[in-house]
């Protein structure tokens, strides 16, 4: 029954999706501001030279002047880039855990909160790359050993002074229950960055993001980085499964991406317990839905990312063996013809 419902929900988008999935992509440069400054300085030197006649000394002076201005422009460009990046709060390696103060808490839905933690200095950035995460650590008074859990911040990597986390409260989840009990002013230990999948612009022509619940956070980190970079022309397809409509996290942000980049970003939502008015997928993510909306495995430079609860991994891609071992590819993606190299499990 769900298979028919899911496909029926996807049909109005199918022809649009296939058109969007086959459009060409192109790359671009990234140091435009720096090069523009350099060109302007060189142009100023050329103007000076052309208005000084044939005097050799003046020609030599003009060359020196142009060189000095070019160096100045490069220096200014570098300082702007470095200033934009800022100092990193998390540097990895032997840094160890850092204690951060909770600045604010916002209720998102019935079981999820947004936590904003202050970085040690107001002009610092997190230091996270795409895609990477942070470890959190907490040890209660009666705990024999600390609880350590990974989280992917939803704040932009360029944001200064804070990080944001979306945390869903799970029954008997030591870390999530502790965080949901925290109030502003309290502190939590963090360590990172923990590298996941190193992303670079146009690394793949098309990526698919298959997420369940709070498994959406690394997917959002990746999608945001792609669309924040004008040089990155990667196409993105999101399949996001949840229990109820209220559980769909970051939906407004994904709708903004879909409205801004309709030829490059599409999102498909699946609910286990949908309302009567729901027109999207119903039940669980299945083979028929993925075959309809995902990019073809043999015709494009594609990568499929999976992040969600254990049941989703088992059905879609097979489980990871450990954080450093992706395990064998299994499940629906293998049945659809994707190779192990085409799939990454967060």
From Swiss-Prot:
Catalytic activity, reaction form: 2 Fe(III)-[cytochrome b5] + NADH = 2 Fe(II)-[cytochrome b5] + NAD(+) + H(+)
Obligatory cofactor(s): FAD
Keyword rRNA-binding: no
Superkingdom of origin organism: Eukaryota
Stretches assigned to the FAD-binding FR-type domain: 95-200
The EC number(s) this enzyme carries: 1.6.2.2
Pfam families: FAD_binding_6, NAD_binding_1
Enzyme class: oxidoreductase
Gene Ontology CC terms: mitochondrial outer membrane
Transmembrane segment boundaries: 28-50
Record-level GO BP terms: ergosterol biosynthetic process
Location in the cell: Mitochondrion outer membrane
Family recorded in the similarity comment: Belongs to the flavoprotein pyridine nucleotide cytochrome reductase family.
Task performed by this protein: May mediate the reduction of outer membrane cytochrome b5.
The name this protein goes by in its record: NADH-cytochrome b5 reductase 2
Classification lineage: Eukaryota, Fungi, Dikarya, Ascomycota, Pezizomycotina
């Amino acid at each position: 029954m769900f298979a028919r419902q899911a496909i029926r929900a996807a049909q109005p988008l199918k022809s649009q999706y296939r058109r969007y999935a086959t459009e060409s992509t192109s790359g671009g440069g990234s140091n435009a501001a720096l090069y523009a400054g350099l060109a302007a300085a060189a142009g100023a030197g050329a103007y000076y030279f052309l208005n000084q006649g044939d005097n050799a000394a003046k020609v030599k002076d003009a060359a020196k002047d142009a060189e000095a201005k070019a160096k100045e422009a490069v220096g200014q460009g570098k300082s702007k880039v470095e200033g934009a990046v800022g100092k990193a709060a998390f540097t990895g390696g032997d840094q160890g855990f850092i204690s951060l103060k909770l600045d604010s808490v916002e209720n998102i839905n019935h079981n999820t909160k947004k936590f904003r933690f202050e970085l040690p200095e107001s002009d610092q950035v997190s230091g996270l790359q795409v895609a990477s995460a942070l470890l959190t650590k907490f040890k209660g008074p009666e705990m024999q050993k600390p609880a350590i859990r990974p989280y992917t911040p939803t704040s932009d990597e360029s944001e200064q002074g804070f990080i944001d986390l979306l945390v869903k409260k799970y029954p008997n989840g030591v870390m999530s229950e502790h965080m949901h009990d925290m109030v502003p002013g309290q502190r939590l230990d963090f360590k990172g960055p923990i590298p996941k999948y190193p992303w670079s612009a146009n690394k793949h022509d098309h990526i698919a993001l298959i997420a369940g619940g709070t498994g959406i956070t690394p997917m959002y980190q990746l999608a945001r980085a792609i669309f924040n970079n004008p040089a990155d022309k990667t196409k993105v397809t999101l399949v996001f499964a949840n229990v109820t409509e209220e559980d769909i996290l970051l939906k407004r942000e994904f709708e903004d991406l879909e409205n801004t980049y309709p030829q490059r970003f599409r999102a498909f939502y699946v609910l286990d317990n949908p309302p009567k008015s729901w027109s999207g997928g119903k039940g669980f993510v299945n083979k028929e839905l993925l075959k309809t909306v995902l990019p073809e495995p043999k015709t494009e430079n594609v990568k499929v990312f999976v992040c969600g609860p254990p049941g989703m991994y088992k059905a879609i891609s097979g489980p990871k063996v450990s954080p450093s071992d992706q395990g064998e590819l299994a499940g629906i993606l293998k049945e659809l013809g994707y190779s192990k190299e085409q799939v990454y499990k967060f």
